[in-house]
UniProtKB/Swiss-Prot annotation:
The modification Phosphoserine is found at S182, S183, S192, S216, S227. A motif (TFG box) lies at residues 379-399. It comes from Mus musculus. Belongs to the LSM14 family. This is Protein LSM14 homolog A. Residues 149-170, 194-203 have a biased composition (Polar residues). GO terms for cellular component: cytoplasm; cytoplasmic stress granule; cytosol; mitotic spindle; P-body; ribonucleoprotein complex. Residues 149-287, 321-358, 397-439 are annotated as: Disordered. Essential for formation of P-bodies, cytoplasmic structures that provide storage sites for translationally inactive mRNAs and protect them from degradation. Acts as a repressor of mRNA translation. May play a role in mitotic spindle assembly. A motif (FFD box) lies at residues 360-376. The modification N-acetylserine is found at S2.
């Protein structure tokens, strides 16, 4: 093989010391490590050669196998390399590329996935040796077709010297031997000392594996390693996105709400505060309040002046009593003693006058009930004016009288006594007497409750 003949691309028949014959295309020859690489290799087994461990032939076609030179028993050239169809020496041609063909070897200028290696169009992907050796940038995965990779790459050039170009590229085989995954299909091949020593020798001279990148003829730039600090900062920023409010969006919303001068703005129904809030009021984003120490009740109570509070409370009670006395007048000639129950209650209150004064709000020896929640110490019937005022405060003032139906339901009084109801019927106004519960139709009140004392004012409508 030293006669200057370019054997690269020739079909080689190789017999190892284990009496196993291989056939493949000569890929590279590494003179430094004394290794030979064959592509598109097929194993024919030991055939009829005498050996202690016969191995049957295999139908698989391996992408490439690297053999140690000292373990090769015989090596013969079966077919010379096919002639290359090169373009004529035309100064107008700057760059050219050949498409994928069915030939066993392409142009020297067609680079494969290893940077400066020839591309083979007919190499079928095999998972056997590809998983054993792997390739730089693939990290253990099986190699794809060299012709496909070469056709996809855009930087292809033409070369004339076939032998010299591949002689310079023999050192580029070493990065191919990246450690990859093993396959059970390689068990018969591992028994061969040629294969084992070739793998050991190649792995011993392996440089540091390059970072994984795209399979292209252009050397991939190694990506800087991502530090843990950068990852933590990125996660922290993502967490702050959900916590920090967005003042810019709120400002834009406020700017959109500004009304143009001279144009009246239509009233809008807010959904819980503002229109863009989606039912949210002024939600505190600061989180729950944190108290540094317990609440001091003694210092808080010392800030209040109990005497002033009691004095203000008694003044309010006196004002209420004066107003109630002025409003208590007999209505329709009725005296307070119309009801025997009221007379009895008033007498009981007179007898049970509080001897301790107004400051004693609760005396458990005297009664179970207290005097705090009671506005008036005397049991009495609510007057018509007071009941009307309570009804107006509770239900509101009607805009106009309803014709044919009762106005509004009266407020219930104390104990079992009913409130006062007003109903407006057709053609008249009916006022229910005391003791009657409100809520009936005014038009029927005059007929159904004729036995009660009532005041009826007849008014003729339009």
């Amino acid at each position: 093989m030293s006669g200057g003949t370019p054997y690269i691309g020739s079909k080689i028949s190789l017999i190892s010391k284990a009496e196993i014959r291989y056939e493949g295309i000569l890929y590279t020859i590494d003179t430094e490590n004394s290794t030979v690489a064959l592509a598109k290799v097929r194993s024919f087994g030991t055939e009829d050669r005498p050996t202690d461990r016969p191995i049957p032939p295999r139908d698989e076609v391996f992408e490439y196998i690297i053999f140690r030179g000292s373990d090769i028993k015989d090596l013969t050239v079966c077919e010379p390399p096919k002639p290359q169809c090169s373009l004529p020496q035309d100064p107008a041609i700057v760059q050219s590329s050949l498409g994928s063909s069915s030939s066993s070897f392409q142009s020297v200028g067609s680079y494969g996935p290893f940077g400066r290696m020839p591309a083979y169009s007919q190499f079928s992907p095999s998972t056997l040796v590809g998983q054993q050796f792997g390739a730089v940038g693939v990290a253990g995965n099986s190699l794809t077709s060299f012709g496909t990779e070469a056709s996809n790459s855009g930087t292809l050039s033409q070369s004339n010297a076939v032998g010299s170009a591949f002689t310079q590229d023999t050192r580029s085989v070493k990065p191919q031997l990246a450690q990859g995954r093993s396959s059970p299909q390689l068990d018969p091949l591992r028994k061969s000392p040629t294969m084992e020593q070739a793998v050991q020798t190649a792995s011993a001279h392996l440089p540091a594996p390059a970072p994984v990148g795209r399979r292209s003829p252009v050397p991939a730039r190694p990506l800087p390693p991502t530090s843990q600090k950068a990852i933590d900062n990125q996660e922290h920023r993502r967490a702050e996105v959900h916590k920090v409010p967005r003042p810019e969006n709120e400002q834009l919303r406020n700017d959109k709400r500004q009304v143009v001068p001279g144009v009246p703005s239509a009233p809008r129904r807010g959904r819980g505060g503002h229109r863009g809030g989606r039912g949210r009021f002024g939600i505190r984003r600061d989180g729950p309040m944190k108290f540094e120490k317990d609440f001091d009740f003694e210092s808080a109570n010392a800030q209040f002046n109990k005497e002033e509070i009691d004095r203000e409370f008694h003044n309010k009670l006196k004002l209420k009593e004066d107003k109630l006395e002025k409003q208590e007048k007999p209505v329709n000639g009725e005296d307070k003693g119309d009801s025997g129950v009221d007379t009895q209650n008033s007498e009981g209150n007179a007898d049970e006058e509080d001897p301790l004064g107004p400051n004693c709000y609760y005396d458990k020896t005297k009664s179970f009930f207290d005097n705090i929640s009671c506005d008036d110490n005397r049991e009495r019937r609510p007057t018509w004016a007071e009941e009307r005022r309570l009804n107006a405060e509770t239900f509101g003032i009607p805009l106009r009288p309803n014709r044919g139906r009762g106005g509004y339901r009266g407020r219930g009084g104390l104990g079992f006594r009913g409130g006062r109801g007003r109903g407006s019927g057709r053609g008249g106004t009916f006022t229910a007497p005391r003791g009657f519960r409100a809520g009936f139709r005014g038009a029927r009140g005059g007929r159904e409750f004729a036995d009660f004392e009532y005041r009826k004012t007849t008014a003729f409508g339009p």
